[in-house]
């Protein structure tokens, strides 16, 4: 096979970029589907890719995606186990020691309901309709330390336990129209324009608390502040008295009432038949929440003896009060009602607002050993409500027997370096069946893994004249 030599400077720059990416990345979930050369859904990661298909179609089961990231919560850290490996004792101190100062939990899910790709001449048009759920929470270790060590470990105003949380949850529909073209034999570009309809949104604007014990009197002093905003379906609303209700009417029209817009853009450049590079940006956009918005706030109220200068000050109970609480149900309920008055949640209608999508950036380098085997290195990062989260992945993808695609990946994530993934895609006539995960260990220990991604689907690749991605000249066939 005739080979075209790339300029030496191109290769040096590509290798240098990948080395810098490896040195700076920490991690976020990546799916082996993104690297599968025979899987049409690789376009989700790289809209500029030149697929070797004339048409692609899927309905309901084309792509089902579940993604979990959990930096520190572990089942094994919560318990002490007996000789048979069964949980015997809850060890809160051990659990608290296993936490980081800042911890993260993320949950993302996607379900493609309809997909259609159609090639006209050398250009590819795409259409996707699906539902996405994105959620992430960043939280401190303060609450777990308080449970594990007790308030006696936090003596003095200068040594409080700090409890913080940043929560973001969003669900929406996505209707996307895309276009891919080969500008030259070396350069391909692609993109998608997305019409979005928000279903649900919850976001914290402030959520923190501080507690310490006075070293002389052992009184507990607590300060807290909570502020959240949300957009809910009509089934959830705030009534005239300010109470949150969940018995409102619901109609299908509510699924189309919070409009938004987003775009994906990508470019792929082939230095020669072996080296190529990809740059992409996904989910650059927003959703306008204009219906049934509400706010939630919680600040300490002056409800009596335990209120002191904006703080909840608990100096203890005398024996008579303790006896009444333990033996008198009416007194106990009255006491608890009084405590609740200090920490009342207030709901109120909220004006219209916008939220940005979780924008994702991607840089990838590919090396094709031959027309059946590819090695890739990828740096990826996502702007979440709780901050920026990067990722680094190396991948191998092999094609066998013209109808079997196997992909192996390794991904680095924050506080986790054991994410070995595997994906298999099989062609049966025009039917492409695939199953992937980015963490094989997570399949066997889901309660003790730092991250897990699973994707499964069945896609129909129609009118495929040639299954080889690269022809005898070493150039992708649709570039001729």
Give the positions of each predicted feature.
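N-terminal, post-signal peptide beta-strand-biased segments of exported outer-membrane/organellar beta-barrel
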Residues: 26-133, 137
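Residues that define the transmembrane beta-barrel architecture of outer-membrane proteins
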Residues: 41-43, 107-112, 169-175, 259-263, ...
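Residues on the lipid-exposed face of transmembrane beta-strands in outer-membrane beta-barrel proteins
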Residues: 47-49, 109-118, 127, 175-183, ...
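Repeated loop/turn-to-beta-strand initiation elements of outer-membrane beta-barrel proteins
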Residues: 55-57, 123-125, 186-189, 274-277, ...
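Membrane-embedded beta-strand positions of outer-membrane beta-barrel proteins
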Residues: 59-61, 127-129, 189-191, 267, ...
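Transmembrane beta-strands of outer-membrane beta-barrel pores
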Residues: 63-67, 131-135, 195-199, 281-288, ...
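Outer-membrane beta-barrel translocator/channel fold
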Residues: 101-105, 138-171, 231-237, 409-480
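Transmembrane beta-strand segments that form the barrel wall of outer-membrane beta-barrel proteins
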Residues: 252, 372-383, 392, 402-415, ...
């Amino acid at each position: 096979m005739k080979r075209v030599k790339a300029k030496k400077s191109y290769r040096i720059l590509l290798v240098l970029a990948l080395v810098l990416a490896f040195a700076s990345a920490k991690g976020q979930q990546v799916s082996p589907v993104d690297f599968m050369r025979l899987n049409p859904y690789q376009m989700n990661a790289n809209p500029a890719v030149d697929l070797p298909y004339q048409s692609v179609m899927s309905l309901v089961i084309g792509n089902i995606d579940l993604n979990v990231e959990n930096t520190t919560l572990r089942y094994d850290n919560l318990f002490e186990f007996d000789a048979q490996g069964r949980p015997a004792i809850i060890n809160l101190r051990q659990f608290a020691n296993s936490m980081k100062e800042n911890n993260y939990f993320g949950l993302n899910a996607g379900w493609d309901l309809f997909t259609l790709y159609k090639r006209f001449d050398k250009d590819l048009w795409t259409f996707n309709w699906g539902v996405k759920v994105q959620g992430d929470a960043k939280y401190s270790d303060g609450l777990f330390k308080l449970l594990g060590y007790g308030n006696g470990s936090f003596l003095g105003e200068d040594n409080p336990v700090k409890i913080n949380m940043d929560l973001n949850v969003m669900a929406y529909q996505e209707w996307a129209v895309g276009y891919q073209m080969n500008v030259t034999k070396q350069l391909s570009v692609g993109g998608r324009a997305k019409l979005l309809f928000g279903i649900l949104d919850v976001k914290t604007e402030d959520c923190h608390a501080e507690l310490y014990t006075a070293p002389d009197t052992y009184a507990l002093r607590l300060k807290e502040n909570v502020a959240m905003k949300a957009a809910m379906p009509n089934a959830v609303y705030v009534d005239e008295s300010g109470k949150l209700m969940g018995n409102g009417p619901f109609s299908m029209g509510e699924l189309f009432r919070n409009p938004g817009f987003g775009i994906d853009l990508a470019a792929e450049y082939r230095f020669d038949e072996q080296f190529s590079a990809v740059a992409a940006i996904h989910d650059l956009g927003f959703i306008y929440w204009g219906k049934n918005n509400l706010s939630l706030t919680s600040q300490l109220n002056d409800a009596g003896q335990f209120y002191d200068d904006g703080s909840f000050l608990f100096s203890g109970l005398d024996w008579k009060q303790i006896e009444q609480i333990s033996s008198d149900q009416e007194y106990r309920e009255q006491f608890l009602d009084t405590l609740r008055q200090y920490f009342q949640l207030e709901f109120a209608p909220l004006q219209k607002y916008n939220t940005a999508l979780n924008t994702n950036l991607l840089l990838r380098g590919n090396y094709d050993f031959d027309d059946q085997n590819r090695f890739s290195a990828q740096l990826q990062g996502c702007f979440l409500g709780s901050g920026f989260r990067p990722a680094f992945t190396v991948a191998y993808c092999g094609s066998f027997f013209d109808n079997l695609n196997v992909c192996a990946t390794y991904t680095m994530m924050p506080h986790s370096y054991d994410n070995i993934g595997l994906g298999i895609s099989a062609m049966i006539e025009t039917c492409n069946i695939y199953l992937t995960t980015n963490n094989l260990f997570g399949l066997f220990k889901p309660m003790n893994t730092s991250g897990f991604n699973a994707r499964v689907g069945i896609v129909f690749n129609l009118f495929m004249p040639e299954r080889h991605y690269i022809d005898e000249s070493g150039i992708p066939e649709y570039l001729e």
